[in-house]
Amino acid sequence: MKWRALVCCGIAVLVGGCAQIGYFVQAAHGQFSLLSEARPIDEWISSPGTEGKLKSRLTRVKEIRAFAARELGLPDNDSYTTYADLKRPYVMWNVVATPELSLKPLQWCFPVAGCVNYRGYYSKGEAQAYAAELRAEKYDVEVSGVPAYSTLGWFKDPVLSTFIQYPDGELARLVFHELAHQVVYVPGDSKFNESFAVAVEEAGVERWMELHGDEKTRKAYGAYKERKRDFLALLLKQRKALTANYERDVSDDDKRKEKAAIFQALKDEYLVLKENWGGYSGYDRWFAEPLSNAHLSAIATYHDFVPGFRAMLAKQKDLGKFYAAVRSLSTLNKDERHRQLAGLGESTSVTAGNTLGNDMR
């Protein structure tokens, strides 16, 4: 899930109250530190001190960036024309929280981004400290690393060391996804925004592979999509089971027992998936913390409306017309646009995409 930069931090501090000042200060410091560390990609490529492998990856990003503007109609601006070596595994860490017996996530509201289902920190320690506060209040909590995010065109989003080594298909997917947020973004509607970006990334990578993917690249990305599809299906299955459990007319203790059984089933079935994948362990990080509702709450944000957006794109048969139709849809009230997307996607099956919202490669 991509945390939207708090680009109006000064205003936010004034309106957020004393309890929020520390949070907004770290957000402002983190964003501007990121920008100060970025240098133009061409400088990195021409520098004798840049390793050959990094030069190759940065050259690939330039090709992907040009393709995004030329073939996909995505914004042709300064985003992803600079590079920053952060010397850490993630650009930030998101905190997601839900009640103990519910999948409905807490929301935090910010300028520009509106209300979102997560709270981002540039420091893992600060994210974990806030997560501990929420756990003390009996919330289910997840802390997940984020490799990239979008400032919605307010700043020059840099290419980062946190994702530059991704294989070509996954690198293109991420760039297309983040640029899509600059095309259409509705403050306070994460499910709409993320599902739209997933639909764009899927269409974009398909076109990229047709024109630029060799057999090895296509095979690698195909395997990636199959694993992601399998894992998503498992998560959706257990999310459905949890929803049914929390709706039962039984005691909270009974719900807690069934909740534990569902999460154990999730772990057991994941081990079977790993065996079927030949031991691939890329999703092991998802189980690094004790499983909770928070882990599964984000699945709806990144999946539920993707089928509807796919149906819209199939009908328009042109990305420009698709973007225009999505912009028109975005002007409706939230309930109505959700209703229309749900109706469009009713008959569409699940396929893989950036549906997990974090670094689930």
Annotated model-derived regions:
Residues 1-7:
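Bacterial N-terminal signal peptides that target proteins for export
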Residues 7-16:
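Bacterial N-terminal signal peptides
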Residues 35-52, 106-116, 289-290, 307:
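Acidic/histidine-rich, surface-exposed loop or edge segments in extracytoplasmic proteins
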Residues 46-50, 59, 63-73, 180-184, ...:
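Sec-exported extracytoplasmic/periplasmic mature domains
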Residues 235-361:
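Pan-zinc metallopeptidase signature
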